[in-house]
Structures are given as C-alpha cells and as structure tokens.
Amino acid sequence: MTNNPLIPQSKLPQLGTTIFTQMSALAQQHQAINLSQGFPDFDGPRYLQERLAYHVAQGANQYAPMTGVQALREAIAQKTERLYGYQPDVDSNITVTAGATEALYAAITALVRNGDEVICFDPSYDSYAPAIALSGGIVKRMALQPPHFRVDWQKFAALLSERTRLVILNTPHNPSATVWQQTDFAALWQAIAGHEIFVISDEVYEHINFSQQGHASVLAHPQLRERAVAVSSFGKTYHMTGWKVGYCVAPAPISAEIRKVHQYLTFSVNTPAQLALADMLRAEPEHYLALPDFYRQKRDILVNALNESRLEILPCEGTCFLLVDYSAVSTMDDVEFCQWLTREHGVAAIPLSVFCADPFPHKLIRLCFAKKESTLLAAAERLRQL
C-alpha cells in the first residue's frame, strides 16, 4: 500500500480554469478596469432587494417545489404570453433552475445520448461543449464569420446527418452581439422539419436586444417550440448575477425529462429569491421593457468614447458586449493581447478565440459595457492610448 493520492481519470481532460476566471483574477491582480466578465458594477432594483428581505423575514426559507415556486412560474407564463404570444402551461412547461447554466446542462443531459451529434454555432458560450461531452455527445461546429456572424443555411443543412440530435443557438448572441430574426427561425425550421432534431435556444439576453423588430424567440415559432427548450436568466435581466436563478420553457414531454435531471442536480432553487422575482415581474414589468434603451445608452457611451481610438468597432445588435478589432494596434494573438492589455494598460477584456474550437485567425476581443458610465469612460480613455 502506498501513500500516493488516488487521482481520478478526468472526463474533461482538455478543460482548465475558464478564461473568465483567469481574466478577472488578472484584472484584480493589476487593479485593472474589468470589462471581461459579464457582470455589472452597479446594483439591481431596490424593490427586488426589498421583496427578498420581506420574504426572508416572513420565513420563506425552506425548500421550494422542485419545479419552482408557483407564483414565479405563473409570472413567467404571463410574461411569455405578453412578449411572444404564447402562454406556456404553468405546471408542465416551466422549470425554475439554479441559473441559466443549470437549465442548459439539464436540457443537454436530458436530450443527448451517447454518439448523438449536436450542432453549435461558433463562437459559442463555453458551457455547451462540456455538457455535451459528459453525455457522450459529439459537437459539430459551424463557424460564423465576422463582422455580422450570420448563419449560412446551406452550410447548416450540409451538417445535418442521421445522428444529429440537437441544435443549440444563442440569441442575442454572446460573444458576437448579433441577434436572430424570425427569418432565421423560419430557415431553421425548414432545415430540420423532416428530422427528429431538438432545439435549445439560449435566450438569456432576451431583454437586451437593440433590433427594431425586438427579440425573436423560438417560443414565437409555433412549430419549433414543440421541440424546443427556451432558456432565460433573471440574473441578466435584473443585474443580479449572484442570485443564480434562471428558467426554461419546453413542451411537457421534454420538460419531464429535464426535471428528472434537475431534481438530482439541485432539486430546488432559492425560495425567497423566487418569491421576490415573482413580485418584481408582476409589479414592475417596465424594468425589462426598458432594458433595451438602458443598455443601448451604455453601448453608445462606449462606442462614442472609442471612436477616436485605433480599435475597429463591430456592429452590436444585442447583449451587453462589444467586439473590437485590434489589428491596427498589435500583431499579438488575442489571448496574449488581452493579457498584455490588462497588465500594461489596466483594461481587462476577453479574447474571442476561447469561444471557438478551431483556430480563430481574427484579432477580436470582447468588452462588457454592463458598467457605470464612469467605468466605461475611464476604460475608453485608456484604450484610446493604445
């Protein structure tokens, strides 16, 4: 018998600490302005905080129902009908989760079997691929090209096979800041209608959409929503990322499978937070209705402040992120450039290549503008010096 520690064989040997954690740590080390990780430097609504304190004081501190507090699921159903013309069933279609990340993981785990192929659009959020791998799935990536990152539907159709089980899309899209229109959902339906393929629509930034047409949701498409999971996040909507409360909307047969996973991941979600969110949704719908203008102003502050810089600004149709091309500044790759930018100029950003599996030849970085005006102006002043 030896004293050597027993080391498990990794199921995810290629993964280390996420770039978001790395860049935030580097920003803290160098006291840099952190435009890397997508969290605000301002607080959420006072009313929401007051309702949380109220429900805690009232003793709502025990387990919530596994599917979510009834009042919150009812408020979600009402909001969904108001925005997308579809009212999901409160009992069978809506599941409250520990953040959108849990909803994504539970949905992927419920739908993907060993050997199934899952189509993702690169650049893509980094939580998709590990969840697919843990379920034995195979990621099939379709690269979207800057500056507009639109889907080539002929190339998409060519990716489909008898093994395709799932398509994961994200709109508004992190990190490219582009949005889908209803024409995109129509094209998706045309491509998969004859196949047994499910859809996960990651819509955590649904309320941060600057398109004149407003947010296009999979839930507004009658055929697609019968085989789709829509995922959303209260943390993004109410500037409370630390609360980690999200939800998913799906047809009853899909929801039933998602809940089988959910009940053994977290079982239930923070009770007083759910009750407070239900109160907020009912009492102040103007908050989420005003979010496009709120974040448009922040986007424009940063864009205008960078106009005199050597950074090329890409179109931003949604999310709280802005892509910039630094080709005129440096020949470094994007990871090295972000590290240098944090150390030497005191601004932390995210390299776009980390959202892609294949080599990414473009010199693009992502800036988060979910910040106070003073933070954005201070960061822009440093970036103009490049």
Language-model-detected regions and their locations in the chain:
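Conserved glycine-rich beta-strand-loop-beta hairpin in the small C-terminal domain of fold type I
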Residues: 278, 294-303, 313-326, 360
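A short helix-loop-beta submotif of the ANL/AMP-binding
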Residues: 134-140
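Conserved PLP-anchoring active-site segment centered on the Schiff-base-forming lysine
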Residues: 110-132
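Conserved core segment of the aminotransferase class I/II
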Residues: 3, 220-221, 225-296, 300, ...
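Active-site phosphate-binding strand-loop segment of PLP-dependent enzymes
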Residues: 144-213
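N-terminal small-domain helix-loop-helix segment of the aminotransferase-like
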Residues: 3-99, 106, 281-283
